[in-house]
């Protein structure tokens, strides 16, 4: 007899109900719990899957390159990047008749196409690509790379080529490889590409496979490098009149520290970026060689963590030198701990990418493609949110599955768990304080505006934030501090090291240090409320994962356990899983506030209508009326009685997103018994209906478990929420700026 899905669990495969399918899907990636899984096998499987992951990424990027080269307008866009709209790909089957076909035949194309809002055109142009041929070459190269990765993944699962457990647990060598090899060398390689290809192309000098070995990126060659006269490489940078992609106004410098933006492209100087990547390469290559591997020199991480020597003097413990003994084994033997730390880092970095992409745009002319700027910011902030929640989820799984209290007695982990009540209660009062005060201010202001006395609003200037902006050089507030005070030491140094920075921060035409007022103060605190509450839920979920006052023995129940009836006071909503389920909603809503704020603030800057944001953002009705309602009008008019526009696809997506989102509540606000009764009734009717009763099923249909229904509900809520806002964001921005 053929074995049933799932093959990895005999227990589930023999389940006679539809639970088999649901739990099979839910535990497919929980390798640890699969039948016959050994620790070594677990590491090998995960290692091999990394190659599969890379293959998917390369295939995806290859597809973007291929479709733009085949169906896009890259070569036309390069000639006039500010006015030609970039095409992502053709639309093969435009529905809804000739009107829709006409509406989507746009951006100079002869057939219906989609516009690209991902910024890839700007990226490829900046890094030196100039022809469709370049794009095709890139896509074929990545396709070959994806194939190699798939082969490598398969190869590392074969007994002869699968690494041993000891190899995976060699922390120092792994750090050497990741820091020096992956981060350091790839940054060095990228510097090489920028210096040898991108910078010459930006100055009108074509560099291709035919001449890259004979074209010198700098007239002095390697002479200054070997003689230690490195300053030569920074001399004669591009002038402020440089026309990107031509030799007009171009210099010869390759590694600079100019600061600010290229006046024409409004993006960071390529030579500054090359310098940045070179510095990162040097730092990481050195960092990768600090640990003891083959030669018996360098740091041993275990020795450092177990050391009793103090930071200063011989004291082994104290406020600034908390004990870390036992952490090496704990971290090195727990994949969940490692993953939690990696996700926490990646989450922060992804959010930083969102911030920096708009404040310091790295790609030529992207700052003027407003829809792309909005899409990239929102995209990266949402992804950061998902990743951060994942960090806490795996931290909790670590505490349930891998944490050994004996091994960690008295160290920092133990201390955190021992005073978890203090941590949780502090987060709680901060959340309560922020929530009541922020909402109180908004509601007060709403009432004042509603009663026709807007002058009675409570408006607070963000003086501390303005001070930070002034210290960084913003002169508008007249605070005369550090970089905004021309007599200060900071200004003297800044004039030497970052000559263009002050001009950039005070120009008023970019998104660097936007002027802030009372509306910003309020929404900043609303976002702080969301962040602190999300953190409270996540931290409490993780710290109580093994046990709490109500239920001291959660360990053997695992990470996700359902309600246990009224026994022990009821175990509803107290598993670690339940906390992350709740935190997901807070995370999504918080990032909603973040992206609403960013989008409205920037719309007012781009439309040169700052007064609208400043006046309407101080009360809730202003947000609802002047941001959400006002900006959804273009969207809702994608289809109307007078015809259709190229926003119609977003209008449909907006509608469909709401539908998916609302469907989520059917699973979220419901009980198993109701569904079980409904299922029994449908089954009964089915079995008694002629023709229909010829079709039977082997699994007995049963209602979803509480945890499953929550997952299905959360998935609909999340996907619907993101689809709805994505459609709103893109259509409202593209509707205004094309």
Curated annotation (Swiss-Prot):
Instruction: Give one GO molecular function term.
Output: oxidoreductase activity
Cellular localisation:
Cellular thylakoid membrane
Its quaternary organisation is: The PsaA/B heterodimer binds the P700 chlorophyll special pair and subsequent electron acceptors. PSI consists of a core antenna complex that captures photons, and an electron transfer chain that converts photonic excitation into a charge separation. The cyanobacterial PSI reaction center is composed of one copy each of PsaA,B,C,D,E,F,I,J,K,L,M and X, and forms trimeric complexes.
- Give the organism the record lists: Trichodesmium erythraeum (strain IMS101)
Q: Which family does it belong to?
A: Belongs to the PsaA/PsaB family.
What reaction does this catalyse? reduced [plastocyanin] + hnu + oxidized [2Fe-2S]-[ferredoxin] = oxidized [plastocyanin] + reduced [2Fe-2S]-[ferredoxin]
Q: What is its main location?
A: membrane
- Residues recorded as binding chlorophyll a B1, renumbered to this chain, are 658
Give the EC number(s) under which this enzyme is classified. 1.97.1.12
According to UniProt, the name of this protein is Photosystem I P700 chlorophyll a apoprotein A2
The family database entries (InterPro entries) matched by this protein are listed as: PSI_PsaA/B, PSI_PsaA/B_CS, PSI_PsaA/B_sf, PSI_PsaB
């Amino acid at each position: 007899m053929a074995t049933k899905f799932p093959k990895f669990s005999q227990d589930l495969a023999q389940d006679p109900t539809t639970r088999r399918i649901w739990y099979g899907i839910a535990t497919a990636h929980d390798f640890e719990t699969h039948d016959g899984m050994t620790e070594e096998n677990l590491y090998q499987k995960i290692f091999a899957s990394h190659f599969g992951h890379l293959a998917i990424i390369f295939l995806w990027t290859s597809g973007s390159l291929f479709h733009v080269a085949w169906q896009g307008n890259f070569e036309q866009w390069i000639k006039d990047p500010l006015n030609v709209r970039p095409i992502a790909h053709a639309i093969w089957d435009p529905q809804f008749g000739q009107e829709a076909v006409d509406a989507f035949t746009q951006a100079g194309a002869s057939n219906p196409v989609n516009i690209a809002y991902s910024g890839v055109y700007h990226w490829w142009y900046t890094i030196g690509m100039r022809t469709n041929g370049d794009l095709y070459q890139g896509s074929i190269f990545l396709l070959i790379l994806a194939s190699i990765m798939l082969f490598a993944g398969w190869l590392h699962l074969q007994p002869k080529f699968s690494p041993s457990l000891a190899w995976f647990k060699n922390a120092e060598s792994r750090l050497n490889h990741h820091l020096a090899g992956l981060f350091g060398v790839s940054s060095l390689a990228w510097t090489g590409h920028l210096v040898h290809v991108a910078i010459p192309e930006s100055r009108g000098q074509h560099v291709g496979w035919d001449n890259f070995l004979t074209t010198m990126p700098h007239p002095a060659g390697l002479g200054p490098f070997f003689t230690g006269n490195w300053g030569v490489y920074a001399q004669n940078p591009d002038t402020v009149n440089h026309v990107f992609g031509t030799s007009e106004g171009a210099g010869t410098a390759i590694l600079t520290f100019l600061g600010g933006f290229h006046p024409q492209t409004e993006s960071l100087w390529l030579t500054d970026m090359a310098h940045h990547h070179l510095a990162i390469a040097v730092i990481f290559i050195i960092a990768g060689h600090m640990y003891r591997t083959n030669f018996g020199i360098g740091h041993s991480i275990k020795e450092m963590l177990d050391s009793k020597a103090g930071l200063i003097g011989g004291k082994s413990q104290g406020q600034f030198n908390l004990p870390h003994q036992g952490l090496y084994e704990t971290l090195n033997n727990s994949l969940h701990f490692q993953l939690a730390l990696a996700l926490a880092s990646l989450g922060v970095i992804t959010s930083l990418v969102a911030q920096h992409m708009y404040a310091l745009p790295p790609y030529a002319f992207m700052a003027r493609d407003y829809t792309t700027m909005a899409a990239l910011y929102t995209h990266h902030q949402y992804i950061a949110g998902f990743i951060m929640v994942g960090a806490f989820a795996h931290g909790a799984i670590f505490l349930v599955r891998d944490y050994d209290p004996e091994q960690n007695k008295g160290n920092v982990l133990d201390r955190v768990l021992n005073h978890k009540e203090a941590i949780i209660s502090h987060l709680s009062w901060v959340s309560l304080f922020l929530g009541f005060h922020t909402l109180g201010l908004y509601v007060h202001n709403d009432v004042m505006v509603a009663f026709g006395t807007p002058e009675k609003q409570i408006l607070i200037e963000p003086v501390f934030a303005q001070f930070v902006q002034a210290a960084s050089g913003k002169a508008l507030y007249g605070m005369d501090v550090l970089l905004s005070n021309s007599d200060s030491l900071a200004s003297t140094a800044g004039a030497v090291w970052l000559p263009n920075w002050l001009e950039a921060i005070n120009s008023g035409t970019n998104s660097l240090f936007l002027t802030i007022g009372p509306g910003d103060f309020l929404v900043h605190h609303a976002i702080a409320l969301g962040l602190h509450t999300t953190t409270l839920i996540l931290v409490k979920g993780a710290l109580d994962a093994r046990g709490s006052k109500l239920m001291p023995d959660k360990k053997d129940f695992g990470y996700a356990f359902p309600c246990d009836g009224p026994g022990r006071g009821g175990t509803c909503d107290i598993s670690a899983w339940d906390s992350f389920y709740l935190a997901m909603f807070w995370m999504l809503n918080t990032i909603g506030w973040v992206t609403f704020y960013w989008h409205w603030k920037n719309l007012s800057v781009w439309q040169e209508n700052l007064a609208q944001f400043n006046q309407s953002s101080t009360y809730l009705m202003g947000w609802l009326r002047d941001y959400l309602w006002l900006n959804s009008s273009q969207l809702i008019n994608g289809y109307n009685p007078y015809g259709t526009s190229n926003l119609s696809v977003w209008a449909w997506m907006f509608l469909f997103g709401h539908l998916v989102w609302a469907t989520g509540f059917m699973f979220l606000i419901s009980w198993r018994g109701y569904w079980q009764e409904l299922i029994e009734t449908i089954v009964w009717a089915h079995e008694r209906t002629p023709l229909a009763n010829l079709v039977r099923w082997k699994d007995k249909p049963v209602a979803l478990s509480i945890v499953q229904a929550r997952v299905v509900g959360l998935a609909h809520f999340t996907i619907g929420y993101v689809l709805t806002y994505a459609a709103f964001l893109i259509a409202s921005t593209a509707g205004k700026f094309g």
